């Protein structure tokens, strides 16, 4: 049983955790999507994300098969993502946005 306990009008109830579709994350009951700002396109796969990050100077690490990792040469930044794109959450999206402020943003899907 997973979800969030909600207290409203003196009543406590459990709201079941929603299943997110691939490439979206549920935060506060709203789905999130990662958008490549220059093109306005939603990132819908790791292949699309890898192409965008590579163009920005990020290099892919292949050491750990359970993670999808990128490093930017000349910096200490590392982006670590779950190997399964369906587990890609808003936390991962915001990590990408913070490290690439002008290139990505997170929006309500």
From Swiss-Prot:
Disruption phenotype: RNAi mutants display reduced seedling height phenotype, because of abnormal cell division. Ubiquitinated. RPT4 mediates its proteasome-dependent degradation. Interacts with RPT4. D-box [RxxLxx(L/I)xN] is the common motif recognized by the E3 ubiquitin ligase APC specifically acting during transition from metaphase to anaphase. This is Flowering-promoting factor 1-like protein 1. Induction: By auxin. The lineage of its organism: Eukaryota, Viridiplantae, Streptophyta, Embryophyta, Tracheophyta. GO terms for cellular component: cytoplasm; nucleus. It is found in: Cytoplasm; Nucleus. Overexpression results in reduced growth of the primary root, an increased number of adventitious roots, a helix primary root and a delayed gravitropic response of roots in seedlings. It comes from Oryza sativa subsp. japonica (Rice). Belongs to the FPF1 family. GO terms for biological process: negative regulation of mitotic metaphase/anaphase transition; regulation of flower development; regulation of root development; response to auxin.
């Amino acid at each position: 049983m997973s979800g969030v306990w909600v207290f409203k009008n003196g009543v406590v109830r459990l709201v079941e955790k929603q299943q997110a579709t691939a490439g979206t994350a549920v935060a506060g009951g709203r789905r999130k999507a990662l958008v490549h700002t220059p093109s306005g396109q939603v990132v819908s796969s790791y292949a699309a994300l890898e192409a965008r990050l590579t163009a920005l100077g990020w290099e892919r690490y292949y050491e750990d098969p359970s993670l999808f990792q990128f490093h930017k040469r000349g910096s200490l930044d590392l982006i670590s993502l779950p190997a399964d794109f369906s587990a890609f959450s808003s936390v991962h999206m915001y990590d990408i946005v913070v490290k690439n402020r002008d290139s990505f943003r997170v929006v309500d899907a």
